[in-house]
C-alpha cells in the first residue's frame, strides 16, 4: 500500500503546510534510519544579507510580515500598502514555502514502502521511478529495515511536476514507518540545491525539513535558504509548524526566525492559529506577529480567504500606531 496524504495543507503558513506532510498518523519519532544513503547537511547556498534585527516601520512592515509568513520575497508593491481597490495586477505571484514542502512531501508519499517488504532480508535496498502529477519523474533509491520500519534514501528529480511547479535536483531522506508500512512516524528531507520553476518565477532552494507525526497533529521543523531570480537569498531558520487537521480545514501554529537580506531578521509567532479550509489557497482567519529591533512589531490579520490587514507598532511601546488598508492575499 502506498502511504498517501489524508488532506492537503492549504497555507502555510498557508508557511510548510502546511505540509501535506501531516498526512499520516502514528506516534512520534526520533533519529535517522542509517544506511549508505543518509543525507548530508546542505551547504550549497549561503545567506549574505543583514544579520541584525530589523527595525519594523510603516514602510517595510507589510513586506516583512508577508515575507515571514510565506518564507520568501513577495510582491514589491506590498511595501506601499496597496489596497484592494488599487492593487497592481502586475504583482507577480511568489511561491510559498509550504508549496515547496508539499512538492517533496507528495513525491515521498509516492514511494510504496510496503512493496519493499516480505522477503527474507531484514534490510533491503530498492530502486524505482515515480511520475509527477503533471509530468517529469523522480527516481529513488531507498534502503529499508523490515524489522523496525526505518528507511533512508536519495531521490533525484527530473522536471518533476506537481501543481504546475517543476523541480530538478536531488534530495536525501530518512525516517520511519509503522511496521506494516501503512503510516509515517517521522521523516526528514535534506534538500540540496534544487531548482524550482513555477510560471516565470524560478528559485534555488537548499535546506532541511523534519516532521514528527502524532495524531491528530504533526510538528514540522524547517531550516531553508531560498534564492530568487534576482540572486537574493532569504533564510527561514528554526521554523516550527504545529499542524492540526480538522474535518475540512487545517489549523497551523507557526514560530521561527526569518532573515530578510535587506532589513535583517524578525521573529515570527502565532497570536491566533491560522485556519485554512481545504478548498481555499489562503487562510480565512488567524493572526501572526513579527518582532524586530527595540520591540518594533507588526501583526498580520487574516480577515477572510481573500483579504488580510497589517497593524504596526513602530515605536516598540506596545501600541499599534499604523494600520494598512485591506490587502488582497493574491498580492502575496
Report each predicted region and the residues it spans.
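Bacterial N-terminal signal peptides that target proteins for export
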Residues: 2-12
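Generic detector of short alpha-helix boundary/capping microenvironments
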Residues: 12-13, 276
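Hydrophobic helical h-region of N-terminal Sec-dependent signal peptides
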Residues: 14-18
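Bacterial signal peptide processing site
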Residues: 25-29
Amino acid at each position: 500500500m502506498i502511504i498517501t496524504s489524508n488532506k492537503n495543507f492549504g497555507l502555510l503558513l498557508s508557511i510548510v503546510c502546511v505540509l501535506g506532510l501531516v498526512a499520516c498518523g502514528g506516534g512520534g519519532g526520533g533519529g535517522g534510519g542509517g544506511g549508505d544513503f543518509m543525507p548530508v547537511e546542505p551547504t550549497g547556498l549561503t545567506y549574505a544579507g543583514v544579520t541584525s534585527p530589523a527595525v519594523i516601520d510603516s514602510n517595510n512592515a507589510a513586506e516583512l510580515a508577508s515575507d515571514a509568513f510565506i518564507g520568501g520575497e513577495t510582491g514589491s508593491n506590498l511595501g506601499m500598502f496597496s489596497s484592494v481597490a488599487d492593487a497592481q495586477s502586475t504583482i507577480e505571484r511568489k511561491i510559498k514555502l509550504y508549496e515547496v514542502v508539499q512538492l517533496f512531501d507528495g513525491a515521498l508519499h509516492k514511494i510504496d514502502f510496503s512493496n519493499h517488504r516480505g522477503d527474507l532480508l531484514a534490510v533491503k535496498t530498492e530502486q524505482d521511478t515515480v511520475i509527477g502529477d503533471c509530468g517529469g519523474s523522480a527516481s529513488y533509491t531507498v534502503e529499508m529495515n523490515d524489522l523496525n520500519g526505518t528507511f533512508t534514501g536519495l531521490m533525484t528529480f527530473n522536471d518533476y511536476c506537481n501543481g504546475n511547479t517543476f523541480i530538478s535536483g536531488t534530495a536525501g531522506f530518512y525516517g520511519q514507518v509503522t511496521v506494516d508500512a501503512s503510516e509515517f512516524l517521522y521523516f526528514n528531507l535534506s534538500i540540496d540545491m534544487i531548482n524550482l520553476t513555477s510560471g516565470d518565477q524560478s528559485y534555488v532552494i537548499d535546506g532541511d525539513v523534519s516532521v514528527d507525526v502524532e495524531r491528530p497533529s504533526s510538528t514540522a521543523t524547517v531550516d531553508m535558504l531560498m534564492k530568487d531570480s534576482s540572486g537574493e537569498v532569504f533564510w527561514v531558520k528554526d521554523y516550527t509548524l504545529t499542524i492540526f487537521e480538522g474535518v475540512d480545514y487545517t489549523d497551523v501554529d507557526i514560530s521561527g526566525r526569518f532573515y530578510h537580506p535587506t532589513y535583517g531578521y524578525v521573529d515570527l509567532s502565532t497570536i491566533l492559529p491560522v485556519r485554512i479550509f481545504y478548498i481555499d489557497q489562503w487562510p480565512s482567519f488567524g493572526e501572526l506577529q513579527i518582532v524586530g529591533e527595540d520591540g518594533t512589531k507588526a501583526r498580520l490579520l487574516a480577515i477572510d480567504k481573500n483579504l488580510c490587514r497589517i497593524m504596526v507598532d513602530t515605536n516598540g511601546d506596545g501600541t499599534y500606531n499604523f494600520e494598512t488598508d485591506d490587502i488582497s492575499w493574491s498580492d502575496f
